[in-house]
Amino acid sequence: MRALIVAEIASNWEGSISKAKKLIKECKNAGADAVKFQMWRALDLYEGHPDWKIIKKSELTFKKAEKLKKYADEQNIEFFCSVFYPEAVDCLESLGVKKYKIASRTCLLNDNYSLETLESIAKTGKPVIISMGMGGNKKRIMKIFSKNKITFCYCISEYPA
């Protein structure tokens, strides 16, 4: 079995489509099989943060996701996301992503939309990569994704990384 090399772009594109496209191309040139972004809403996770304007600018909207997915396809590199709210699943499904990533904070089920987001992803039947770095109830997570192919990742969730 060949390892999947995923380049984590996350929010490092700072809301700039041109910067994101450059990163996608560089990831492809470096030999990555896939690029992964994060699809969250600033209001859900960062309301009141002192760097609100910068954070809000880095939000991956549906329109931006569509542009980046199209560009990744043109570069022949897979595009997928960590998803933090259920409507993002609908967006990514309309774009035809092949898999989903679940952040360890989502596995804690502490955020407003965590459970609903997990259930929305599970309903797609697509493979999921699940981080358990912050913990969470692995048995419950496995039950939610009983019909999906699951890959668990274990890491130290210490930021900045």
Label for each model-derived stretch:
Residues M1-A161:
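Catalytic cores and adjacent flexible loops of soluble metabolic enzymes
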